[in-house]
Regions:
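Extracytoplasmic/secreted envelope proteins and their assembly/folding machinery
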Residues: 3, 28, 32, 43-46, ...
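Short, glycine-/small- and polar/acidic-enriched structural segments
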Residues: 1-124, 140-143
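Secondary-structure end/capping motifs
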Residues: 186-266
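Pocket-lining segment of extracytoplasmic ligand-binding domains
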Residues: 119, 129-221
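Conserved C-terminal helix/tail region of periplasmic/extracytoplasmic solute-binding proteins
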Residues: 257-311
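Short, solvent-exposed loop/beta-turn-alpha elements that line the ligand-binding surface or hinge
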Residues: 4-13, 166-171, 239-248
Length: 330
């Protein structure tokens, strides 16, 4: 956004209005209300928004990041059984990492209720509060996204008990994707394709010069929070993520199944959540093949293979969702 890539892709006469929001849930609410037209959100907010609207409100049109989440714990916890009686944090009840933790605990035969009871007490809270609580010894660990996982290790003295990448086929699982309002996609397909083109251009920029991309990310973090990440934190987190237009649809279905299994989501059919037609058209024009296993509305193959995956970080204390509105000026 800040370097003008998206504005250039949209072209003259289009008023791009970016918004930073506090969470994926807030972004979906803004999408519902018409306050924004598109947003970068995690998988579970997209699933929840799709389910709440009866499959009518939104479509996933591209992936953005894959990977980058872990369960980091204090010394003395080296196996699942060591977690009995501990307190673990997640970013929010029902969010992507919260579902991942509760699902993994259930798979280990460890009970954790949504009220904070059970064998392990799960405490949903802001990531910044989690870091402070971990350093102070008020919690025993947390399942969090990057760069918070790396910060818990480097600043909190923790170690990784579970790297979420080890739980997914090929180590690939969606962490951020581009969603648009279904009505906006229907009414303005050319503008949505331009947004996708801007995303692909951004991916190319990151892939071509990761060092410059890291510096740009840190500049953005400093502009929002007033403080830069340490170079070691940024590098450690960067190595855990992949910036890719592939929405990794199999992992979205897996996240849904996990949420249903632990009673955080009613069963929902996600077969219509993807519309990757415009992404595939843009990739084709760039000489890149489609792929990834999702299906478009007409039954065509969806998703997209990354043009050479490179790691990317999600900003530090930056809000966890970003929305935008694109309108013709005048």
């Amino acid at each position: 956004m800040e370097d003008g890539t998206f504005a250039d892709a949209l072209g003259a006469g289009i008023d791009l209005q970016p918004h930073t929001l506090n969470s994926g849930t807030e972004a979906i609410e803004a999408l519902f209300s018409g306050a924004i037209d598109a947003a970068f959100v995690g998988p579970n907010p997209a699933i929840n928004g799709f389910a709440q609207s009866g499959g009518e409100a939104l479509r996933i049109v591209a992936g953005t990041t894959s990977g980058g989440a872990a369960l980091v714990v204090r010394d003395g916890i080296d196996a699942p059984d060591d977690l009995i009686g501990t307190t673990l944090a997640t970013p929010a009840l029902g969010n992507t990492q919260d579902v991942a933790l509760r699902s993994w605990l259930a798979g280990q035969g460890i009970d954790a209720t949504t009220e904070g009871g059970g064998d392990v007490s799960v405490r949903p809270q802001e990531n910044a509060d989690t870091l402070t609580a971990f350093v102070d010894g008020a919690i025993d660990g947390a399942w969090v996204p990057e760069p918070w996982a790396t910060r818990l290790v480097l600043e909190g003295g923790g170690h990784v008990l579970v790297d979420e990448a080890t739980l997914w086929e090929g180590g690939r699982f969606v962490t951020t994707q581009l969603v648009v309002a279904a009505s906006y996609l229907e009414d303005h397909p050319a503008l949505v394709r331009a947004l996708i083109a801007g995303l692909l251009d951004s991916i190319d920029t990151v892939n071509a010069d990761p060092a410059a991309a890291q510096a740009a990310v840190n500049d953005g973090i400093e502009a929002i929070t007033g403080k830069r990440l340490a170079d070691a934190t940024l590098a450690g987190a960067w190595a855990k993520l992949t910036f890719t237009p592939d929405p990794v649809p199999g992992s979205l279905e897996g996240s849904k199944e996990h949420a249903v299994a632990i009673d955080l989501l009613e069963p929902v059919d996600l077969s219509a959540i993807y519309d990757l037609t415009l992404l595939n058209q843009e990739l084709s024009d760039r000489g890149q093949p489609p792929g990834g296993g999702a299906r478009g509305p007409a039954g065509g193959r969806g998703a997209a293979n990354p043009p050479r995956p490179q790691p990317v970080i999600r900003p530090g204390r930056r809000p966890s969702a970003c929305g935008s509105r694109a309108r013709r000026a005048g």
